[in-house]
Amino acid sequence: MIIDTTTVQAINSFSRLKSLNEVYGIIWMLVPILTLVLGITIGILVIVWLEREISAGIQQRIGPEYAGPFGVLQALADGTKLLFKENLFPSRGDTRLFSIGPSIAVISTLLSYSVIPFGYHFVLADLNIGVFLWIAISSIAPIGLLMSGYGSNNKYSFLGGLRAAAQSISYEIPLTLCVLSISLLSNSSSTVDIVEAQSKYGLGGWNLWRQPIGFIIFFISSLAECERLPFDLPEAEEELVAGYQTEYSGIKFGLFYVASYLNLLVSSLFVAVLYLGGWNISIPYISVPEFFDFEINKVGRVFGTTMGILITLVKTYLFLFIPITTRWTLPRLRMDQLLNLGWKFLLPISLGNLLLTTSSQLFSL
């Protein structure tokens, strides 16, 4: 069988077209992921700058002002400094656990952003079990902290890792029960469905008013999960030097701070999504898709998505003032007080709140 030149050229052009389509497919898949990572990076820089400015205002002092206008580049300068510092390893520590621990803490928190709807149809993974996937993923982070503490071969680090694990277990259960109550109210565990369930009555339809007890418990539990004051026992300076971070330096030390602010941002985003209506305009009977005519007008679709993202971020950063202010307001708890608050106070109340929510949903059928 003889194949002429035209056939060979057709085969070559087809194979070239197929390879180009594969490349375009990979690029199209990576674009939303890279966009999300870039947005998260900018969000963390904004949080660090906000915290420093708010802290300076509370303490009546001047915050960062030399690195960039109003000190906005100070966090970037600190990160660059840590990037070029030497990475030290404990002489008798477990090098593998010591190196893997910070990565697990950061990656597990980063994965949580995949189920957050920043705007209408602007979510990386719209799953039916979105909120519970976040809880499952976030429960992996304490394993990384425990590995870091154990791999350091240092009593302060190991105690800090144990405290982080105990604190996470204690407050994960009330947090899960609050999320389960929200799922019952919305008849779905998808983050997108939960936001849309709050859209009908505007500001009055927020789950904040339907679940005030759950909101308070969720806020306290998320503070404990983020290890923010008054729940920063795993790294209490007066007791454990720096907890599981004691032996770390350089970029690995910086990863723990990145994980802390990632966790703070994702917790605030979930508060905005679960309790504050997400991307919706706070006007009764007007939702973002209807207001900007998503189905017909492409320009309106782009503008509406942008407005939804801005609304979500405004709610998130306004809520961030509360945990930042709490840091400089309340003293640190003792370990026994922390565990008693989680197991003897928040757990029974969150369970009672879940039973009340279930009863109200059954009677409304």
From Swiss-Prot:
InterPro entries for this protein: NADH_UbQ_OxRdtase_su1/FPO (IPR001694), NADH_UbQ_OxRdtase_su1_CS (IPR018086)
Gene Ontology terms for molecular function: oxidoreductase activity, acting on NAD(P)H, quinone or similar compound as acceptor; quinone binding
Catalytic activity field: a plastoquinone + NADH + (n+1) H(+)(in) = a plastoquinol + NAD(+) + n H(+)(out); a plastoquinone + NADPH + (n+1) H(+)(in) = a plastoquinol + NADP(+) + n H(+)(out)
Membrane topology recorded in Swiss-Prot or TrEMBL: Multi-pass membrane protein
Keywords: Chloroplast, Membrane, NAD, NADP, Plastid, Plastoquinone, Quinone, Thylakoid, Translocase, Transmembrane, Transmembrane helix
Its biological purpose: NDH shuttles electrons from NAD(P)H:plastoquinone, via FMN and iron-sulfur (Fe-S) centers, to quinones in the photosynthetic chain and possibly in a chloroplast respiratory chain. The immediate electron acceptor for the enzyme in this species is believed to be plastoquinone. Couples the redox reaction to proton translocation, and thus conserves the redox energy in a proton gradient.
Assembly and oligomerization: NDH is composed of at least 16 different subunits, 5 of which are encoded in the nucleus.
Name the record gives this protein: NAD(P)H-quinone oxidoreductase subunit 1, chloroplastic
Upper lineage: Eukaryota, Viridiplantae, Streptophyta, Embryophyta, Tracheophyta
